[in-house]
């Protein structure tokens, strides 16, 4: 496949991810998780593309970190031609191996669509069990313990290799970050490659996943602002459905340095984005790069580059946690 990009600005966000990923219909979550027990919820969206009614079985095979089969529940589904149905399986698990940066234990859910004993489709979904919470008093809590995020913004390119997301280059980048003492990374400022997130899951690197560098106000002549009004929801949905099974992702971002956040015009856009994120995944907090008039819909209030005197004291009285980047002014 040959791709040619026109209108490349000096700081381009364009790149190439060589693998197509189309299996976005399985969502694995672990609500009520703890070291003693957890509930694994597997939601599978099934589409009947046949011309007649179908009765199928949705089967999920749960494999432990060592590959041992733990359970194999199933659910019968009947649906009409063209109908889309969500099958929900809830699986109880005792004494799960918790995922963390120091011990990134991964389970696998193999979801199969069966009819008359024949496998029609199969998707394998790696996932981790890790209770995630946040509070003003303690900040981000992973597996019940406060975690200080030590990391930085990492763009999608691979140095002299350019913006092609070669799997080994993505893995090496994550390994270098972890060996340098990072425990977290912010994806700046567009969707990372699946290979990058897979490596973060395996190595144990926490991720702030962030989709947009512009909304409606352009930063460059030919940037994404031309398409944002018509495409933001489709692109955001694609990122969330693709990435939400990664245990390494602990936070969603909705923008980077957007001019609109300083104006009242940005507030309804931020609310639209925040509401859409929560409709697809309510298990993680939201944030944005740059504080401003739009911070109402988010849980984590950022302080990007500087914190002016008095700001810390004022925000500490709210229900939002401050995330500081680069510099605190005094």
What are these regions (language model features)?
Residues 1-194, 199, 203-207, 235, ...:
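Secreted/periplasmic carbohydrate-active enzymes, especially glycoside hydrolases
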Residues 174-177, 184-330:
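Substrate-binding/catalytic cleft of secreted carbohydrate-active enzymes
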